[in-house]
Amino acid sequence: MSFCLRLAGIFCALLMLFGCGPDRNAFAPVCPTAHLIPALADVTRYAGPGPTHDVTDLILQARVTAVNGSCAAGDDSALLPAKVQVTLLIQRGPAMQGREADVPVFLAVTDGDTVRDKHVFAVHVAFPPNVDRLTITSPDIDLDLPVSANKSGASYGVIAGFQLTPDELTANRRSGG
């Protein structure tokens, strides 16, 4: 009988230890809002120079279709760790040499109208045989946002788009992007 009482005592002590830890009534941190700017959400690449192109000159077309992320309370209360992924729809064109390409994408963190940080990275796409259209999601992009009692993650915005050349940006604006 004393063995059972000792076992019950150990069990109760373990239950109390498992109850220790972060405040269970604390709310999850608020993440920044993601934005897509139409003029930066599309890219069309052509072979050869010139302002006009035929469909046979098309290397690839791509569109940012989603920006997703998550936040979690970190060890440092002055920083909010966030993970962001960018989802792209990519179409291979007839002028594409090979079946692989790197598409330059950017992620910018804004604070009001100010860009606080910008990260440019390449999303690699490899088209399998007989597949000319893919939806892919970038690897996680880790962000650490400075927060305080007066400034939450909701104070920030995240903008994703393609790192365009001046000609590509002009073409997007002309086409209504």
Model-derived segments and spans:
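Beta-strand elements of well-folded, non-transmembrane domains
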Residues: 66-71, 84-94, 107-113, 125-129, ...
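A short, structured loop/turn motif at beta-sheet edges
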Residues: 76-79, 109-116, 150-154
